Amino acid sequence: MAMTSAVKDELSRLSVTKTCCRRSEVSSLLRFAGGLHIVAGRVVVEAELDSGSSARRLRKEIHELFGHQSDVHVITSGGLRKGTRYVVRVVKDGEGLARQTGLLDPRGRPVRGLPAHVVSGGACDSESAWRGAFLAHGSLTEPGRSSSLEVTCPGPEAALALVGAARRLGIQAKSREVRGADRVVVRDGDAIGALLTRLGAHSSVLAWEERRMRREVRATANRLANFDDANLRRSARAAVAAAARVERALELLGPTAPDHLLVAGKLRLSHRQASLEELGQLAEPPMTKDAVAGRIRRLLAMADKRARELGLPDTESAVTAEMLEA
């Protein structure tokens, strides 16, 4: 997940000046990375992140924007848990922070999607919502056939809200449920690049696009090589089969074959795997490939007619299955 780490590291260091955007990012980050807990009758706000720089950014923003102190707890990897996790926790007046960030509505009920001020905000709020969601639970796969930018969501309402935010940015995202988890996915390569640019991950976009271009060039080269190999195999099989038919034609016609058709037939027998164009260059005087093909075609037609008259196997009988599979 090298690309994911690079994007999160870049986004966690991004400087955002507009207060509304910073608030939207914090609200989204808390919504996608954490939750509300009741501890000893008090509301506690928690967010679990996989990046230390993201945790530091969240802690700083909570203090500067909302005036709350938070603790960061480091949980090291072990057992089933992979990688170090960072838990940002606000215990003192957690309910106040939950209301300020829109995690609780005015009646004190948990908001299941994204807060109203984010959903009804401008494009910058949609960008910030996506930035917070990606820092919380986003992933970016390497460019390729199944490349994707994906965010794991706390529920279907949050997933739909994130899809709506992408739509306001002109980017198509889809929500789906995978193994019981709600996810929002962007699969189109151009859309992934556009979204990363909107989030502010400019260096990561350049790196991702470079890898994407390298992979596409490699894939195109492989396709062309396979195409050329297949064409060569088909041409070789056709040439071998044609030589077998010509050999049978000369047996049927014997000395009655016209000289100009005989020359073309003998060229084919002498150079069984050569292309028609190469046969034309070997002729004296040189001929076009169409002229060579025409003469061989007339030679075969004449021989097949003679075979029908004599009740003998025609030139096609000389072509075996092994020749076509070679």
From Swiss-Prot:
It comes from the Bacteria. The keyword Nucleotide-binding does not apply. Keywords: Cell cycle, Cell division, DNA-binding. One of its GO terms (molecular function) is DNA binding. Residues 275-308 bind DNA. The keyword Cell division applies. GO terms for biological process: cell division; regulation of sporulation. Belongs to the WhiA family. NCBIfam families: DNA_bind_WhiA (TIGR00647). Involved in cell division and chromosome segregation. HAMAP family: HTH_type_WhiA. This is Probable cell division protein WhiA. The gene is whiA.
